[in-house]
């Protein structure tokens, strides 16, 4: 449980901080540098809008679910696992979509190691593991 909590925090916290920069100053160079790469520009208005929508969704849905779920899990409550499963589902779904959607743009710039680990892989891994673990705990299986 604690390993998954820590892995989730290490994975999600930098993303949420980067998105906060973007939400507070969406047209700033700092936001572009953090989210799409130093000196890079948005490919088009759809790229900008989808990034902004995902940032809002993460702050309005993913963060509250993950945070409340983590508190519930730390307290040993079943509702914590239910909220965590919801957060994990969001992380898994969004990042599987982005894994394929952004590959042609992101992969050449950052390389295989970063792309398949931190950039997308860890979000998919945490989402999958947290979803399975939460389901097992809700079913009554303890570790």
Regions found by a protein language model. Give the residues of each.
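Topology signature of small-to-medium multi-pass alpha-helical membrane proteins
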Residues: 1-143
